């Protein structure tokens, strides 16, 4: 992060992402608002990258956050929104990876590792630095079984078959539970028509330490950086005064300039789709049809609704 001092000696930081600022806004300005809350934003963010490494230190982030829901349907909604955000660019040469941070967390929860050791281990697994990972595991006070597990993690990526393979290495119920959650999401996404766009990475352990559940990334062929990233962060907003779950993602707009083929001549209509318990998948299907036609859609769970109903907002 870029840090400096103001004229009173206080430490100032240029924002490295927009998730934390939005968490602060939800915990203060929207502390009495009823969930779910939905935010969208476009803003510049700043991160320190290695010189001559081919990465920018300032770029434009565009993203969405879904606040207040913690069920599988909300994860599914944000995944569909992320996938559609890439599809609308009219360029099918993209890769979409899904993981679960709790797969790594469930493995290290019983180990006597410091926070620094956990972060270093996560970084080596996430970047698939195989030799460095092997050397670092020899420095840690962990059993041979754990060493074998962590050495295998960077290799557990690919199609849906990776989830079945991951189950073979799941040595406790929590690990199995996290894979089964990904399997459930995968089945729903396949039913919605996204099956051939998905890959999975059980060794995805991003550096931002606020994630608590699903995590995902999007890539385009010919673009050397991640263009989309996101996940669930249920504990972050509580640091700003409101205990409420959240999930979201952001897109690096600068990295898309070479792959965008977008028709902005159409003026979209806006719809709200209300759905009752058990109708989330049907509601997402209806939203997908409308979004594929260029419309803006907001999904709203409503307990007193039997089935689904949609309303077009007046312009």
Where are the model-predicted features located?
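Positively charged, Gly/Ser-enriched RNA/tRNA-binding surfaces
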Residues: 8, 17-32, 39-91, 138-315
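Short, conserved phosphate-binding/catalytic loop or strand-edge motifs used
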Residues: 58-62, 98-106
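A short amphipathic beta-strand at an alpha->beta junction
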Residues: 94-96
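Short low-complexity, flexible loop/linker segments enriched in glycine and/or proline
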Residues: 1, 110-112, 214, 313-314
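A conserved hydrophobic position in a structured secondary element of the catalytic/binding core
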Residues: 14, 99, 251
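Short, structured active-site "lid" loops
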Residues: 1-14
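Short terminal or interdomain "cap/linker" segment that borders an active site or interface and mediates
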Residues: 101, 105-136
């Amino acid at each position: 992060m870029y840090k400096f001092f103001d004229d009173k000696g206080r430490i100032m930081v240029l924002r490295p992402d927009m998730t934390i600022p939005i968490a602060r806004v939800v915990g203060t300005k929207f502390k009495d608002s009823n969930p779910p809350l939905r935010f969208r934003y476009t803003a510049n963010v700043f991160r320190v990258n290695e010189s001559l490494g081919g990465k920018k230190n300032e770029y434009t982030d565009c993203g969405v956050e879904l606040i207040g829901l913690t069920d599988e349907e909300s994860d599914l909604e944000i995944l569909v929104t992320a996938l559609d955000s890439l599809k609308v660019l009219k360029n099918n040469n993209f890769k979409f990876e899904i993981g679960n941070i709790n797969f790594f967390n469930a493995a290290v929860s019983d180990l006597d590792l410091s926070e620094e050791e956990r972060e270093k281990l996560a970084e080596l697994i996430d970047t698939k630095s195989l030799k460095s990972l092997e050397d670092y595991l020899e420095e840690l006070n962990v059993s041979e079984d754990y060493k074998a597990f962590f050495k295998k993690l960077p290799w557990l990526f690919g199609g849906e078959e990776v989830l079945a393979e991951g189950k073979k290495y799941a040595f406790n119920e929590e690990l199995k539970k996290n894979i089964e959650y990904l399997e459930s999401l995968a089945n729903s996404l396949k039913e919605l028509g996204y099956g051939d766009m998905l890959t999975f990475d059980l060794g995805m352990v991003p550096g931002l330490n606020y994630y608590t559940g699903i995590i995902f990334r999007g890539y385009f062929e010919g673009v050397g950086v991640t263009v989309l990233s996101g996940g669930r962060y249920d504990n972050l907003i509580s640091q700003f005064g409101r205990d409420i779950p959240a999930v979201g993602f952001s897109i690096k707009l600068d990295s898309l300039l070479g792959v965008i083929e977008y028709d902005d001549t159409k003026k979209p209509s806006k719809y709200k789709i209300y759905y009752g318990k058990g109708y989330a998948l049907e509601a997402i299907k209806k939203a997908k049809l409308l979004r594929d036609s260029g419309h803006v859609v907001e999904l709203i769970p409503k307990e007193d609704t039997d089935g689904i109903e949609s309303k077009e907002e007046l312009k």
